[in-house]
Amino acid sequence: MPVQGSQRRLLGSLNSTPTATPHLGLAANQTGARCLEVSIPDGLFLSLGLVSLVENVLVVTAIAKNRNLHSPMYCFICCLALSDLLVSGSNMLETAVTLLLEAGALAARAAVVQQLDNVIDVITCSSMLSSLCFLGAIAVDRYISIFYALRYHSIVTLPRARRAVAAIWVASVLFSMLFIAYYDHAAVLLCLVVFFLAMLVLMAVLYVHMLARACQHAQGIARLHKRQRPAHQGFGLKGAATLTILLGIFFLCWGPFFLHLTLIVLCPQHPTCSCIFKNFNLFLALIICNAIIDPLIYAFRSQELRRTLKEVLLCSW
């Protein structure tokens, strides 16, 4: 949401420049150099947010309705859906309010708009942080279920999962308020970037280790049944492809946004960096796309959840 003044807010006003006519083309930056700028139409931005909102509401509803899904794993998946819901909802609200203000359909005092902007920024930042945390929590949960299968139910209990969820939400809100309050400090932006890289490394290490264990297990079964080596290789290739897609989507959807934050610290006035800054709305749209993809990867693959979802949809009609 636009804020008066030359300073940029961490989330709300990094995109404070009014949206130009939607296009994909070359725009001139302040030095006259040509750079690629991708403008996201407001309608597309709102549509992506709405799809994500509906998807994640369905996931939360299905998990809440079915007591069989009240397990630690689904607790993390439900909270991931709630985080993605808030990411999409807060960005939709910000876009809608901005459009109404620009069109003159909504009259509000500057102080009220500023307070609303602060609230939306905190919600957006905290939901982004919690979303990354819950992606990491799901990876840790799956890792424990594979490498400590016999002790899993004693290690990952529902009370512990609830305490972890509460800690993640509280930490996300507190740190987001801190980040918003000190948005103009380079250390704040670097902390966010380091946090993203830490989550990326954590997920990569855990999932690669899980893939290696799965390949060893498949190789053992193949030897037991005296199968040919290509069958094991096929399993390994399939697992590697799945892992590449999972981590690739995570990096492609979240990476540009954190690259944006990194460049704000490293080269805020450089012409090339200025070109990248013009695509902030595209980076936010990619995060919303990730919120659309998350339910497909982590939730809708569950047969029990899909069955509950069908019941919810049939009852709603």
Swiss-Prot record:
Keywords: Cell membrane, G-protein coupled receptor, Glycoprotein, Lipoprotein, Membrane, Palmitate, Receptor, Transducer, Transmembrane, Transmembrane helix
Protein's UniProt name: Melanocyte-stimulating hormone receptor
Pfam families (UniProt xref): 7tm_1 (PF00001)
GO cellular component, one term: plasma membrane
Subunit structure: Interacts with MGRN1, but does not undergo MGRN1-mediated ubiquitination; this interaction competes with GNAS-binding and thus inhibits agonist-induced cAMP production. Interacts with OPN3; the interaction results in a decrease in MC1R-mediated cAMP signaling and ultimately a decrease in melanin production in melanocytes.
Cited PANTHER family: G-PROTEIN COUPLED RECEPTOR (PTHR22750)
Family, per entry: Belongs to the G-protein coupled receptor 1 family.
Organism encoding this protein: Miopithecus talapoin
